[in-house]
């Protein structure tokens, strides 16, 4: 559908448990129903789920939250499989498949792993599969301590090229003060820029099961906003909250991005110093400039410099004129080996492949 949106929905532990010590399955069923409804309407849904530790505790019958990181990781290891089984079971009611992705911050900071994660996420969405993302809590350390699922959801939104990020919590949104102890607190409905004043009034969650608070949600909104993604913080218990966000209705606190994702990407590609350059033939030049096509290895005449997969490179024509900048899907050595060859030969030449193109049109800005 032409107006299809990509929505990342992050569900905190407080939302999944309803403030109790157990997963609130009835509540999760309702959220899945809304996601399935939007999925059927042609929208692309990504789930970022907390709750592995809570699910592990419930399954093992632990009476209290352990104080050590190792104990939390034990619970996460047990609970993660229970959690994905629940998501799989509920989405299957609507004939929807899910795909699990376990990530850590390191996956986002390493260029190669970032691109691989993006490729996987894109493949899932393109095949109408709902990605279910969580931190790999069983091996992560700092992430568990800081409640990074909020920030992880922002990074997932960037990976997915999302239009909107919805952070569901146990509060209606961001207030001028903590509404739990200040009856004069008012809901902030629209935010056009995050400053120190806003950060100062962001309170923290009191959930004994989760690790995120309003402060980390503000960080996530800031990260997403810099990438041109709108963020909404809203109560997971609000009826129809996912539908409202898709339809753009007033709900919770809406963080308006300062620029569109395309503008942000253009700025990044143009702003990044090229790590190398490639020269292309006339056919490739015409395909790029006149038809807006991706660059195929067949059209590459030469490769200059040493660069890694995921770095920005300069694309020049045979006369030496810059025609585009783009993100290379292969490193310089690999490009030299596949230059001039058909895409079908990539795997035979390299022993692997990251797709048929050298630079994808979505990762390319023409001069």
Curated annotation (Swiss-Prot):
Residue span, PUA domain: 275-353
Molecular function terms, GO-annotated: ATP binding; glutamate 5-kinase activity; RNA binding
Protein localization: Cytoplasm
GO biological process, one term: L-proline biosynthetic process
InterPro entries xref list: AceGlu_kinase-like_sf, Asp/Glu/Uridylate_kinase, G5K_ProB, Glu/AcGlu_kinase, Glu_5kinase, Glu_5kinase/COase_Synthase, Glutamate_5-kinase_CS, PUA
EC number: 2.7.2.11
Catalytic activity: L-glutamate + ATP = L-glutamyl 5-phosphate + ADP
Binding-site list for ATP: 10, 169-170, 211-217
Protein known as: Glutamate 5-kinase
Taxonomy of the source species: Bacteria, Pseudomonadati, Pseudomonadota, Gammaproteobacteria, Enterobacterales
């Amino acid at each position: 559908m032409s107006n299809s949106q990509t929505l990342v929905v992050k569900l905190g532990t407080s939302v999944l448990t309803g403030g109790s010590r157990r997963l609130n399955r009835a509540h999760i069923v309702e959220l899945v129903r809304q996601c399935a409804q939007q999925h059927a309407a042609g929208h692309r849904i990504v789930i970022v789920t907390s709750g592995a530790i809570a699910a592990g505790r419930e399954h093992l019958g632990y009476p209290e939250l352990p104080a050590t990181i190792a104990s939390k990781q034990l619970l996460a290891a047990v609970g993660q499989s229970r959690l994905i089984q629940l998501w799989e079971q509920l989405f299957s009611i609507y004939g929807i498949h899910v795909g699990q992705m376990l990530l850590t911050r390191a996956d986002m900071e390493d260029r190669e792993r970032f691109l691989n994660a993006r490729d996987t996420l894109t493949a899932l969405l393109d095949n109408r599969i709902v990605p279910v993302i969580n931190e790999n809590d069983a091996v992560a350390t700092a992430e568990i301590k800081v409640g990074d699922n909020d920030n992880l959801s922002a990074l997932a939104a960037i990976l997915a090229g999302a239009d909107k990020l919805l952070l569901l919590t146990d509060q209606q949104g961001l207030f001028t003060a903590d509404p739990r102890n200040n009856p004069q607190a008012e809901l902030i409905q629209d935010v056009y820029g995050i400053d120190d004043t806003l950060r100062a009034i962001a309170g923290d969650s009191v959930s004994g099961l989760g690790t995120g608070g309003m402060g980390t949600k503000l960080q996530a909104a800031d990260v997403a906003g810099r990438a041109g993604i709108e963020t909404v913080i809203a109560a997971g218990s609000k009826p129809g909250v996912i539908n409202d966000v898709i339809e753009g209705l007033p709900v919770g606190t809406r963080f308006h991005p300062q620029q569109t994702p395309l503008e942000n990407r253009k700025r990044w590609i143009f702003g990044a110093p090229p790590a190398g350059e490639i020269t292309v033939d006339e056919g490739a030049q015409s395909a790029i400039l006149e038809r807006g096509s991706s660059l195929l290895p067949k059209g590459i005449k030469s490769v200059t410099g040493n660069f890694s997969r995921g770095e920005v490179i300069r694309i020049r024509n045979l006369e030496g004129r810059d025609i585009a900048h783009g993100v290379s899907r292969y490193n310089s050595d690999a490009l030299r080996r596949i230059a001039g060859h058909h895409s079908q030969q990539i795997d035979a030449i390299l022993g692997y492949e990251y797709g048929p193109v050298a630079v994808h049109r979505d990762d390319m800005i023409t001069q």
